[in-house]
Swiss-Prot record:
GO biological process: nucleotide metabolic process
Organism: Cereibacter sphaeroides (strain ATCC 17023 / DSM 158 / JCM 6121 / CCUG 31486 / LMG 2827 / NBRC 12203 / NCIMB 8253 / ATH 2.4.1.) (Rhodobacter sphaeroides)
PANTHER family, A to Z: BIFUNCTIONAL DTTP/UTP PYROPHOSPHATASE/METHYLTRANSFERASE PROTEIN-RELATED, BIFUNCTIONAL DTTP_UTP PYROPHOSPHATASE_METHYLTRANSFERASE PROTEIN-RELATED
First-listed, main subcellular location of the protein, grouped into a coarse class: cytoplasm
Lineage of the organism: Bacteria, Pseudomonadati, Pseudomonadota, Alphaproteobacteria, Rhodobacterales
Function: Nucleoside triphosphate pyrophosphatase that hydrolyzes dTTP and UTP. May have a dual role in cell division arrest and in preventing the incorporation of modified nucleotides into cellular nucleic acids.
Membership in a protein family: Belongs to the Maf family. YhdE subfamily.
Protein name: dTTP/UTP pyrophosphatase
Site (Important for substrate specificity) location in chain: 11, 69, 151
Amino acid sequence: MTLILGSASPRRRELLAQLGVTPDAILPPDIDEEPRRGELPRPYCARLAAEKAAAVAAGPEDVVLCADTTVALGRRILGKPADAGEAARFLVALGGRRHEVITAVAVRRGDRLWQREVVSQVKMKRLSDLELNAYLASGEWEGKAGGYAIQGLASAFIPWISGSFTGIVGLPLAETATLLAAAGVPLYRAAA
């Protein structure tokens, strides 16, 4: 059995290591991540994780692990900002409000698919112009759903969360461990 991580995210690799799991291969899938018309955040996130898992080429006994993280402000999906201007708009919209961070995990082995979605609540403070401009200049927003990374500089902007911290980062470990175990992946092994 080979474990394939369908993600280029170094954060997901780091989180997997906390379970004593090292992927044998890293094969990020290339799928269309555009939301469908009228699609709500949670079904959107679950669909992307499943589509990513289906898109990774794997043998019948290989295990594919994929995830998708989405930031939702009400019914609005805030994906990865295209540029600093969009990141600024996201951060201003999130400021002073609670929002949801949804991470969907999909594990595939052969024709079997195991899935979970984890929804966490996050409150971001209103950012001053200095904070906003410094954060944008850091570049940390690039490639991050909602335009921020809670485990980085943006941690200073988050006074409150409810839910899974690792889910907000991008891979909810409790749920991921359950799914990997269901697929037969041994957990909690020390690195060789």
